[in-house]
Amino acid sequence: MAAARPILGRVLPGSSILFLCDMQEKFRHNIAYFPQIVSVAARMLRVARLLEVPVLLTEQYPQGLGPTVPELGAEGLQPLTKTCFSMVPALQQELDSRPQLRSVLLCGIEAQACILNTTLDLLDRGLQVHVVVDACSSRSQVDRLVALARMRQSGAFLSTSEGLILQLVGDAAHPQFKEIQKLIKEPAPDSGLLGLFQGQNPLLH
């Protein structure tokens, strides 16, 4: 019997969606590298708009945690409110209406809470999940690291924003490549990942 073909995790604009999770005002001073991860998520949002990739945005209990931060650039998106530590219940109808959907690109906070639970729910639906590691964080770097390892153990792909952007555009001949090139000309800001990944880190091996 032939071995099962591994899932490669390719992303294409026509079968992908971008999830933006809970980047809200009250988290601003508590989440590690908050400005940096919001900046990267904003870059992903701009690319999604250029490539016509659908985008969904959630807010966790906005009455207490405030609105989405303006620097995300999410004007025109209608946030879906939730209290569940997963985006999926709030987005169920949107997911059901997209039978062509294969890949979810996931940005936001917190890694060990809503990002992890969203990932598990999406994997349970048979979707491929690409966690944008430079656009996800937690209050604690330990929680962030263990959550990334946990998601990888469960079958999610850990990807950088630039890696996913270049997969989505696919070709320097793409009509939007010049605009996208301007967005990635400067490297994504440091969000503390190097210290998590360097050395003999058993959680990510």
From Swiss-Prot:
Q: Which Pfam families match?
A: Isochorismatase
Key words, A-Z: Cytoplasm, Nucleus
The organism's place on the tree of life at top rank = Eukaryota
Compartment(s):
Cytoplasm; Nucleus
Q: Name one GO cellular component term.
A: cytoplasm
UniProt subunit comment: Interacts with CDKN2A.
Family classification: Belongs to the isochorismatase family.
Question: What protein name does the entry list?
Answer: Isochorismatase domain-containing protein 2
Supply the gene name.
ISOC2
